[in-house]
Swiss-Prot record:
The keyword Isomerase appears for this protein: yes
GO terms of biological process kind: flavonoid biosynthetic process
UniProt binding sites for substrate: T50, S192
Assigned EC number: 5.5.1.6
Lineage, highest ranks first: Eukaryota, Viridiplantae, Streptophyta, Embryophyta, Tracheophyta
UniProt keyword terms in alphabetical order: Flavonoid biosynthesis, Isomerase
Name of this chain's protein: Chalcone--flavanone isomerase 1
Alphabetized SUPFAM superfamilies for the sequence: Chalcone isomerase
This protein's record includes keyword Metal-binding: no
Record field: catalytic activity: a chalcone = a flavanone
């Protein structure tokens, strides 16, 4: 039977994403859901900027399987709702963004902030509290530089917090840099990668393929209470 513990590591442009990690400041070990490259067509060439790995808490499999077991990878990768269920599901997510090309913290944080604020204002949900959180988000990045191989690490928790950490040596640090208590930002960070307009289609494809396999081999009995739990969380 396939289980999260049987998830394998992945190599993306010589960036190795291990099969499991323990996020900074956390006691839980999360499994590798999927990984892929983020890039863009520039003057006819596909330029690769980062490799992205998305890790999930073990209980994500029974929770998602209650609704998505039996779907093919192709069906999942084309489902906005499936990725939305990952983003909003009541389990931890850990996103590792590792540089292929160098990037400054200021460049990265300003791009993410502009995207978040734009979406929130368009939906009429932007508040003063959100503005204060964005200021803190920009502050923690402003003096950082990320050479190739350096990583930005995000932990999205079901309680609505976003934990941010940095790694310059390829290792996952034990302590986090900052914890921001803002559910919208916590979800927006991972949604920017795997959501409807996510920046890494390759990561979405990897997630869909690996999770389809894990769910389809998961013990049916273990999913009995999963869908009601998802429903309680608005999924």
């Amino acid at each position: 039977m396939a289980t999260p513990s049987s998830a394998t590591s992945l190599n993306v442009e010589n960036i190795v994403f291990p099969s499991s990690v323990k996020p900074p400041g956390d006691t839980n070990t999360l499994f590798l859901g999927g990984a892929g490259v983020r890039g863009m067509e520039i003057q006819g060439n596909f330029v690769k900027f980062t490799g992205i790995g998305v890790y999930l808490e073990d209980k994500a499999i029974p929770l998602l399987a209650g609704k998505w077991k039996g779907k093919t990878a192709e069906e999942l990768v084309n489902s906005v709702e499936f990725f939305r269920d990952i983003v909003t599901g009541p389990f931890k997510k850990f996103t590792q963004v590792t540089m292929i090309l160098p990037l400054t913290g200021k460049q990265y944080s300003e791009k993410v902030s502009e995207m978040c604020v734009g979406v929130w204002k368009a939906h009429g949900t932007y508040t003063d509290a959100d503005g204060a959180t964005i200021d803190k988000f920009l502050e923690v990045f402003k003096d950082e530089n990320f050479p190739p191989g350096a990583s930005i690490l995000f932990t999205t928790s079901p309680d609505g917090s976003l934990t941010i950490s940095f790694s310059k040596d390829g290792m996952i640090p034990e302590a986090a840099n900052i914890v921001l208590e803002n559910e919208k930002l916590a979800q927006a960070v991972i949604e920017s990668v795997i959501g409807k307009n996510g920046v890494s289609p390759a990561t979405k494809q990897s997630l869909a393929s690996r999770l389809a396999d894990l769910m389809n081999h998961f013990d049916e009995k273990a999913t009995t209470d999963a869908e009601p739990n998802l429903s309680k969380n608005g999924l």
